[in-house]
């Protein structure tokens, strides 16, 4: 008799490369009124979540990837007409499975690079030119997901760029909140979208967590100043990035880009020259090679090279 509480004729089919639709009929026997259903589903054999739906007969799984396998089952929630405080949960149906198809290609899968700069508080996205477009290229759409469960949420459209635009700057991002961004192209006149570009996943750090520490400058002779610093692990960025993929030093109006070191020597200076500099760190994620995170600049430090006479006098005293 317990099988009578199972939803009937449970089926699932792929509607397009990014959508699957599950349908069912009510159970053969209802213990009062059916007040809803719970769908348990997975993608590629990894259970993700349970979805509660109203007393409808269909549910759409959206924002899937092409060639992604969905496995789902469903159970009904019953409420006896004579006892509003009692709920009867029926038996789960046999799982059904479907795999989304490959898209009929309208252009090559797009790609982009993204850089977040703490000092500017913005994500700078540079989208590469579209390739192999079927028809006329109609522009790119930027999409984003945010939140602790951003992987489970639908992509939200941020902006539609014109066919000529390749750059977009995203502002107002919140520290310590997980984000994912991607793009897709549209072909005209069909208005069909391309596949989504490989997303970039990241979190915004607080400045004090990523800025270089213990920055110091010391003159070693009349023509040389050494600058040192520490790049402590970043509790936010380090989840995604290797510490200090590179550093940048600002000296007056000049910028120097260095490899992953913790010392730089300014040479060829004149005696009694004051030098001021600050430094930031460039983080490169391990899982998102097209993303770069630039920390805030450190406080400015200053050092002055001694005169030749000062050095000669000091050596004479020794």
Swiss-Prot record:
Domain Fibronectin type-III positions: 6-103, 109-207, 211-308
Alphabetical list of Pfam families matching this protein: fn3
InterPro entries per UniProt: ECM_Regulatory_Proteins, FN3_dom, FN3_sf, Ig-like_fold
Entry keyword set: Repeat
Coiled coil: none
Database matches in SUPFAM superfamilies: Fibronectin type III
Note: ONCA and ONCB are the primary targets of protective antibody responses.
Protein name: Oncosphere antigen A
Organism listed in the record: Hydatigena taeniaeformis (Feline tapeworm)
